[in-house]
């Protein structure tokens, strides 16, 4: 393997059979995204969406794609990922008016378009002071305030086609890896549905409950 290859590149050169494609990996027992570059010999265990870490990476990336879709369709709005409910996540979509079924259909369609276009998800690591400036310039005041509290010298953020955001944890490397998701109107917001860890070819069962 070439020194500095990503975990994604390494997997593509291995003859390894997995029930489902990898979405992250344990490197010397520490969870890393498939963007991670390997420069020295490491113990690597690839993880799919049936693992807790893999499911979180998949879900986190869905959040990112949802945020990008909302930003394109409703640039003056805001979406907040809220509580886990009904085998998914309740999302508070702040449009300044009630959310309609038509809104949800538009967002779902835009998310699917982002997946179908097989877009790279780029990882950036910069000094935290620089990241704070970037998010302040974009008007993401709450994200900038959050970064001020991390106490870290460097911050990792991600972008899809120039749309950037900060998430704590690993992400997938391409939108095409999001093979299954659901988005539905749920009370006065959205329900983002994710694949079942027991059977990732199916969405988690929809059980309507209080958000």
Where are these regions (language model features)?
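Auxiliary tRNA-acceptor-end handling modules of aminoacyl-tRNA synthetases
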Residues: 36-55, 78-84, 90-211
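Ubiquitin-like/PB1-type beta-grasp interaction modules and other compact soluble beta-rich domains
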Residues: 1-63, 67-85, 109-110
């Amino acid at each position: 393997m070439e020194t500095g290859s990503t975990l994604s590149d390494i997997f593509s050169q291995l003859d390894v059979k997995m029930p489902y494609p990898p979405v992250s990996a344990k490197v010397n027992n520490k969870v890393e995204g498939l963007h991670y570059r390997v420069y020295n010999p490491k113990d690597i265990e690839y993880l799919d969406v049936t693992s807790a870490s893999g499911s979180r990476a998949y879900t986190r990336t869905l959040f990112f794609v949802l945020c990008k879709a909302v930003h394109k369709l409703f640039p003056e709005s805001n979406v907040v990922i809220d509580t886990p409910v009904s085998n998914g996540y309740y999302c508070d979509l702040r449009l300044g008016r009630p959310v309609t079924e038509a809104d949800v259909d538009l967002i779902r369609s835009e998310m699917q378009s982002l997946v179908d276009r097989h877009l790279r998800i780029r990882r950036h690591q910069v000094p935290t002071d620089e990241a704070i400036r970037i998010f302040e310039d974009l008007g993401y005041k709450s994200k900038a305030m959050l970064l001020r509290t991390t106490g870290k010298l460097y911050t990792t953020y991600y972008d899809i086609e120039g749309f950037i955001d900060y998430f704590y944890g690993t992400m997938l490397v391409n939108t095409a890896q999001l093979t299954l998701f659901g988005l539905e109107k749920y009370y006065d917001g959205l329900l983002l549905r994710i694949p079942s860890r027991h059977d990732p070819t199916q969405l988690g069962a929809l059980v309507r409950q209080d958000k």
